[in-house]
Every structure is written in structure tokens, then in C-alpha cells.
Curated annotation (Swiss-Prot):
Residues annotated for Mn(2+) binding in this entry: K201, H220, D257
Catalytic activity entry: oxaloacetate + ATP = phosphoenolpyruvate + ADP + CO2
Cofactor: Mn(2+)
Protein name: Phosphoenolpyruvate carboxykinase (ATP)
Organism classification: Bacteria, Pseudomonadati, Pseudomonadota, Alphaproteobacteria, Hyphomicrobiales
Amino acid sequence: MQETGVHNGAYGTDKFGLKNLKGVYWNFGAPQLYEHALKNGEAVLSSDGALVADTGVFTGRSPKDKFTVRDATTENTMWWGGNQSITAEQFEALYQDFLKHAEGMTLFAQDLYGGADPTFRIKTRVYTELAWHSLFIRTLLRRPERAELENFVPELTLIDLPSFRADPKRHGCRSENVVAIDFARKIVLIGGTQYAGEMKKSVFTTLNYYLPEKGVLPMHCSANVGPNGDTAIFFGLSGTGKTTLSADPNRTLIGDDEHGWGKDGVFNFEGGCYAKCIKLSSENEPEIYAASTRFGAVLENVVLGELDRKPDFDDGSKTENTRSAYPLESIPNASLTGRAGQPKNVVMLAADAFGVMPPIAKLTPAQAMYHFLSGYTAKVAGTERGVTEPTPEFSTCFGSPFLPRDPSVYGNMLRELIAKHNVDCWLVNTGWTGGIYGTGHRMPIKVTRALLTAALDGSLRNVEFRTDPYFGFAVPTALPGVPSEILDPVKTWADKAAFDTTARKLVGMFQKNFAKFEAQVDAEVRAAAPDVKMAVE
């Protein structure tokens, strides 16, 4: 077997059970991985120097194909209401079949850290079949120094083989595509998909399992810090603006997607960003655009011009979920330490396509826990067929697919941390105003940024608030530079009766969704629920 690159020779592929490999490329950097990806026909080059790959059938994660070993370790610690199980025997069969499938291959290996805090990070080794996958995970996780590589002993091992096909009968899975995690052995197996996001989210899921035991709240959020050291956390589901809003030229970016919050403050799990890039423009998101159009960026499913090879970020013909992965260093004001102090503000982002939520509201700690457990946004389906009814999406803790433990574990930790550190909490609607999707319009990003700036710099503490009659939270009545009518959503609707009907409908959706959590929270959190009785009749 031919091995090239730097690694711990005393802890090689044999420790994982890999054998009869043709070769291993250890800890290659971007130039070498570009060369292999292009030579192997895995990807093409954009005119700006980005590596552009097509993920084939899977253009997003496949949560229905994700499984966890149910054994003595996980039986009483996993949230089985939100996770699918396989037996230890089925996982072992899958593991052995992965090892067999890898024989004769040349693999790419990366030794990386999941987590910027040395106390809580997890040493992660990732074997990939594809060179561009190796570059992706090297970009997304945190890269050790060369001296650290020579003594690196992994705690978590992940193997990613897109050409592998699972056997549902033999392996206990649903299809030929599989993501399987064994927490006891700290092994992740990914097969049948080229969508690179499965790798990063598997590491995230692992951290979500282990960190609560160590007093750290793992979060699906972005984070930044102001010039005075004031840290802000942004929760939100895909498409709500986590990445866009945390990339603020006046604040230092900690990270765009995954963080831990513990006794010493906030730390990034990653060393890169993974931004949605449909409709990406230099005008609206200059930093992300610049990071996505340069050497070292990895673009997924982005269409290139046939002759000029320029990325067409407006073209969603392959998928609306086009992605750009780039190192944090590509953002001019990013923190390279990935660490910051205790948060002063927590922001929960919701893209409300019903158009009835205010652009910003202040939450009590109990309301914050309620909305954290709810994890609301709304999706708009079938855009190309005209106006359709928005679909509410409730993803608990703003990351249901990545939660191994019961949501109340994370919810209670958040509430305790908010109270302990006297954190201000805000709900921000980045969705629609002036009507439901189809009649209203998207909340202007300039308005959202102005409101966020006022919240983060403390200006909103000194304004007058009203109580929203449907949702019960506090809403500012006026703010310099922001049209006052946009702060009260009913005033933006021409049909006030339709607003009332729509708002009541959304309140009912919140109540129906939260019913499953009511037994796990106290009376104060239950009382924080939206209630149509509050609304003016």
C-alpha cells in the first residue's frame, strides 16, 4: 500500500480495520486535492478558481436514511421519538461490508478537530472515496498543526463511500443510501450519497450527543461578536438567514452553523462555512460572494456558464439547495480562534411565510425556551406553479434531525444559560410582510439588519414596547430609521380580517405542535405559548 502525507504512523488504517487498500493520501491540502478531484473527473473548475462538484441524485441530506445503533449505551439516552435505530449486529454487518468495499481503493484521509475549544473538541478522522469530499471536510472542520498530526489518535472515525450500496434486509436500513452512527464505538458510516453535508452533520450529531454530559449546550446556530466583546447567537432553520445575518462587516464572525455554549462562553465546532448560495450576489452578500468565488471554495450543484465557466448563482435547475463551502479565513473579519465570551443576545430567526409575525420581538426566558423547542419557520412549495399555501415547519431546537437526546435536555440547558448570564432574547421574522406568501413581500434585509443592529447594540432596550395580541411577546412600537407600520404586521395588510384569520391559524399550529412537549416543561413555559384568547376580538 502506498501512503503519502503526514500522519501518525503508529495509528494508521489498520486500527480501523481497513486492509488491502491501494493507497492513502493523508491530510492533503487544497492544491493537492484540487489536482486529484480534477484528474479523477469528480469536479470542474470555475473561472474564479472554485472547485465545482455535482452531487448527483442526492442534493440534500436524507434524514430518513440516518440510523443509530440501539444498545446499552443509547437505550436510555437517545431520543428514540426522533431517531431511527438499527441493532449492533446490523451495524457490524454494515461496517464489515464497508471495509470489504474499500479494498483496492485509494482513500483520502483527514485528521481534524470537531470543536475550537481544546477541552471539548473531538479528534475526528475522516476517510473519503472522493478527493473533493476530503477538501470539503478539511474546509468545514478545524485543521490541526503539522506537529499535532504526527501524534494524532482519533476519537471519532468516519468513512464516506458514495459508491457503496446498502442492503436494507442485511443492514436494517431503508434504502441503498445510508448514514449509520455507533456512539459506543464512535464510528460513522456514510454510503450511497455524494452530498457532502452528510459528513459535517454526522460530526455535529456526535457532538450533540456527548457535549451535554460535559455541561456544554451544542447548538445549530451562527455566532458573531461585536467590537466591545458582546457575543450574539443566531438560531434558525435553513433559509432563515443564519449565515447571511451573522456575516456582518461591523462584527467578528465566530461561525455560521454549529457552536457550543459552556462555562467559558461560545466556541465554533467548525473551521469553515457552508452557505446556501441560490441567488447569491455581490450586492446583498458581498463577503459570502467573495468567499465563494475564489480558490479553495467548494461549490455544490452550482451551474456554470458553458463557455466562460462563471458560476450562475441564480440558476436553481439542479436544486434550490446549491451550496458553497469555504474556510473561515475567507471572511475578512472572521475569528480564527473560533471562541468568544458569554453571549449578550440570543436571536431566533423565523421565515414566516404567513406574514403575521412582527419583524422583531423581545422574548422572556420562558418564551425563549418555548420558541426554541418549537423551532418554527415556514416553507413555500411549488413556487413555479403560482401561489400556494405556505407549509409550517417546526424543527425542535432549530435542528431536529441532529438531536440524539430528548429536546428538553437542550431546552432546559438553554433556559438555564439565558437566566444565568442575563441574556436578551429576540425573535426575528425574516419572512413575509404585507400579506401571506404570494400577496405580501419578503421582509427587506435592510430592515432586518437595522433592527438586529439596534438589538445587539442595546438601542432597543430604550424604546417603547407593546404586547403582541396573538403571540404575547414584546414588540417595539418605533425605531429611528425603520418605518413604524412595518413593526406592526397588521398595519401592513390591506385586509385586516384576513390578517386576523391567518394569525389565529398560525397560533393554532404552534399550539398543536407544542402539545408533545407540554408534559416536559413547567407551567411558566406552557404559559408562554401563543394564545388566540389574547387577540382582540
